[in-house]
């Protein structure tokens, strides 16, 4: 499960192994151009499906080796001359930095090869050098790969480096208190957080990346945090004073885990806010200002938080029911509330929507997303003051808005159309004022197109595309020439995968517990003999607030499961993937249907997909399995305890065993309270959301997989589950695999190989005999 709250508790074995990740030496594939039609809203344009290469022999059957080789691109960054794109390309938990020409003339080339972490990527002013941070150190590497990465500083390296908008300078800190290490909170989840290190005065400095000159800006006693540039690139803001957060470690042996296992409970203790300051980047006295209410909603940081030199945006949520937007003023005036959304249930828009307020680059407009009409839509309002204007309308979601460099257009992605699991890129163009905003869709056809990124010259959009026949890749679209087709820049699927053998999903609906239609994606193996009965599997997605897509999932952490389902399909399984109550893509009423009912109708929505499968003449109703990750694992545990004979076998991957236990974890308490209050307020809901309390009902085989370094759903949930199962004499029905050092979303190659092999064998053993 995934939340907007800052991580507060990490749980791991005290003796968890630190994995050694090996890099892959797989050759790059050449970039391919796929044809696509473009047009205004309503035209019958489509992205053509890739053609399978001619084969002289029988089609290749998917293997686990093939699944491991699928790569996943992320975090693309345009060069400042709009000619190249840098991005991360991950294979089995190992990611390196690549560069590809935006015209697709050459295949992507790696500029890092060691798989070491890369963060904060930005291009130098002349687009010949790429900068990034590694272990807090600012690094530089030649964009053409002619020179290996090296530190920018050779002596006394600075920390917390942040680049100016034009890429010519970096501001950084020297001395002062070192922040607490946050290792173990990221994707690899390795643990090992360290306490903050004491220090004296903190100096803010600015270094030129053009000539190497370096100047002191200001020095403050005590720690300095939140260093950033203002939108004009001429000033810096930062916070000083207050009480820095700290990390407290506890060794704990819960009573239900026996006497010989010691767990480390890592608690992130929040600090108190400090004073915000602004200072000229050339140096001088720093001026204190009121930074506004504590932020809590997913607004973007950086330049688009600044309206002009003096005014900035602050978003926050209040009691999980109100989302507010303020305009702050560095001159000392009190922040002004300019917009508020108030919910009866809870603010359910996810961070993935990127719906926070943004200022247009020219400072004229403020954009944000709101679901005030029941759907997540784009709104604009004048930065100088005035009422918001709704830009997109309809029964669809418009997400991830981003301003063009000239401030006249906003690109976004939406699932407008017949399939809620497809998304396309739209453009909102402002002609003079907000009474003249024209919206057009610039991609169409089957597939999921998300996360548009403008080129600095404003002529092209980079975005991610997936569809039923290909996993996520980066594509680029020229928005100045309607006749030009999108260009594919990466090809992340290994050549061994036969796309012609892949199964395309079909959107179906079936009645939920209250009769409301539940959407789901049905996968039927190609060439299936429908005159006989076959086993089937229900896949329950995680997060609660997520969804299935019309093809590969847009997120790597769920795309690997879509890949594995294609593997299961080629082994003869029918698969169904429901979008139960709480899922995104269907409006706020569906998303908020879990309010005060977690583990109630939402669980029934998912579990009743088995009834739909039983209506299919080619599915054996006695051989249906169920599995899920995280929130889906929680539903799986409910399925085997609330509906113990419906499913022949079940696989729980890092599922929540008890919501009262989940509530007690500071990392998850707020998320839980927003949906179901506290255990004291709603004991009935917490009782229904506690599958560990009913494991005496288990009568069918259960496989449990969990990583010890999981902070999203602490590993202790599975330990408590196993303890309860053993005490009820259910040990013969349970298989339990621990992955030392693994995070919530399985990433490392040896873990993926073991998990997929184990799940496949488990289903074969229990559903095919």
Regions flagged by a language model, labelled:
Residues 54-71:
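A short helix->beta-strand "capping" segment at the edge of beta-propeller domains
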Residues 101-104, 142-146, 209-212, 280-284, ...:
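Short loop/turn segments that connect beta-strands within beta-propeller blades
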Residues 38-46, 50-51, 175-205, 238-286, ...:
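Predominantly five- to eight-bladed beta-propeller fold
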Residues 303, 309, 441-444, 448-769:
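Serine-hydrolase catalytic core recognition
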Residues 94-98, 137-139, 180-182, 199-203, ...:
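Structural motif
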Residues 7-19:
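Bacterial N-terminal signal peptides
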Residues 70-88, 113-133, 155-179, 215-241, ...:
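Conserved beta-propeller blade repeats
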Residues 137-139, 143-207, 211-228, 245-247, ...:
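Asp-box/WD-like beta-propeller blade repeats and closely related beta-sheet repeat scaffolds
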């Amino acid at each position: 499960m995934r939340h907007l709250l800052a991580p507060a508790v990490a749980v791991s074995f005290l003796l968890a192994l630190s994995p050694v990740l090996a890099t892959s030496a797989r050759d790059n594939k050449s970039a391919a151009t796929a044809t696509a039609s473009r047009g205004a809203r309503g035209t019958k344009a489509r992205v053509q499906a890739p053609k399978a290469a001619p084969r002289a022999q029988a089609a290749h059957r998917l293997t686990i080796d093939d699944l491991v080789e699928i790569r996943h691109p992320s975090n693309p960054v345009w060069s400042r001359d709009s000619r190249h794109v840098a991005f991360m390309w991950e294979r089995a938990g190992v990611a390196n930095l690549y560069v590809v020409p935006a015209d697709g003339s050459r295949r992507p080339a790696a500029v890092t090869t060691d798989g070491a972490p890369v963060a904060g990527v930005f291009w130098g002013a002349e687009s010949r050098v790429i900068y990034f941070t590694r272990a807090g150190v600012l690094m530089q590497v030649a964009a053409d790969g002619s020179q290996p990465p090296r530190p920018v500083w050779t002596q006394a390296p600075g920390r917390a480096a942040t680049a100016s908008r034009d890429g010519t300078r970096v501001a950084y800190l020297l001395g002062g208190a070192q922040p607490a290490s946050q290792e173990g909170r990221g994707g690899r989840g390795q643990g090992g957080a360290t306490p903050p290190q004491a220090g004296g005065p903190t100096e803010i400095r600015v270094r030129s990346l053009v000539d190497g000159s370096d100047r002191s800006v200001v020095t403050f006693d005590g720690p300095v945090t939140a260093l950033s540039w203002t939108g004009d690139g001429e000033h810096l803001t930062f916070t000083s004073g207050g009480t820095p957060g700290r990390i407290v470690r506890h060794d704990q042996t819960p009573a239900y885990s026996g006497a010989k296992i010691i767990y480390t409970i890592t608690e992130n203790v929040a600090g108190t806010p400090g004073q915000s300051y602004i200072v000229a980047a050339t140096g001088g006295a720093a001026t204190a200002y009121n930074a506004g209410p504590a932020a809590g909603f997913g607004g973007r940081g950086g330049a688009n938080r600044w309206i002009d030199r003096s005014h900035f945006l602050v978003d926050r949520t209040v009691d999980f029911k109100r989302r507010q937007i303020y305009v702050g003023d560095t001159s000392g005036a009190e922040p002004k509330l300019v917009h508020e959304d108030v919910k009866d249930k809870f603010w359910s828009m996810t961070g993935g929507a990127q719906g926070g307020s943004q200022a247009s680059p020219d400072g004229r407009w403020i954009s944000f997303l709101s679901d005030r009409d029941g759907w997540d839509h784009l709104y604009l309002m004048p930065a100088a003051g005035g009422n918001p204007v709704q830009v997109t309308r309809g029964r669809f979601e418009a997400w991830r808005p981003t301003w063009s460099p000239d401030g006249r257009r906003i690109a976004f992605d939406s699932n407008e159309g017949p399939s809620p699991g497809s998304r396309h890129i739209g453009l909102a163009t402002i002609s003079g004022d907000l009474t003249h905003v024209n919206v057009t869709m610039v991609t169409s056809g089957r597939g999921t197109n998300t996360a548009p990124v403008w080129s600095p010259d404003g002529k092209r959009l980079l975005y991610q595309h997936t569809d039923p026949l290909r996993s996520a890749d980066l594509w680029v679209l020229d928005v100045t020439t309607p006749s030009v087709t999108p260009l594919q820049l990466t090809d992340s699927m290994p050549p061994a995968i036969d796309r012609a053998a892949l199964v395309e999903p079909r959107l179906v609906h079936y009645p939920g517990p209250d009769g409301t239609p539940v959407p789901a994606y049905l996968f039927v193996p190609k060439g299936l003999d429908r005159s006989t009965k076959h086993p089937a599997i229900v896949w329950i997605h995680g997060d609660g607030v997520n969804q299935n897509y019309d093809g590969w999932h847009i997120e790597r952490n769920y795309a690997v499961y879509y890949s594995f389902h294609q593997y299961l399909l080629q082994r003869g399984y029918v698969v169904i993937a429901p979008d139960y109550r709480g899922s995104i893509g269907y409006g706020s009423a569906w998303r908020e249907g879990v309010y005060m009912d977690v583990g109630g109708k939402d669980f029934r929505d998912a579990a009743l997909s088995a009834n739909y499968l039983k209506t299919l003449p080619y599915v054996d109703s006695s051989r249906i399995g169920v599995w899920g990750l995280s929130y889906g694992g929680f539903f799986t545990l409910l399925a085997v305890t609330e509906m113990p004979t419906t499913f022949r076998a079940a696989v729980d991957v890092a599922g929540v065993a008890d919501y009262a236990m989940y509530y007690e974890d500071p990392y998850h308490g707020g998320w839980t309270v927003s949906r179901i209050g506290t255990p004291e307020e709603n004991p009935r809901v917490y009782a229904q959301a506690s599958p560990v309390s009913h494991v005496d009902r288990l009568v069918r085989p259960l496989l449990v997989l969990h990583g010890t370094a999981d902070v999203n759903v602490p590993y202790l949930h599975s330990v408590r589950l196993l303890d309860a199962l053993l005490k009820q004499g259910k040990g013969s029905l349970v298989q339990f695999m621990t992955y030392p050092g693994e995070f919530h979303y399985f990433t490392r190659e040896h873990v993926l190989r073991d998990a997929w092999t184990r799940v496949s064998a488990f289903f074969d053993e229990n559903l095919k005999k």
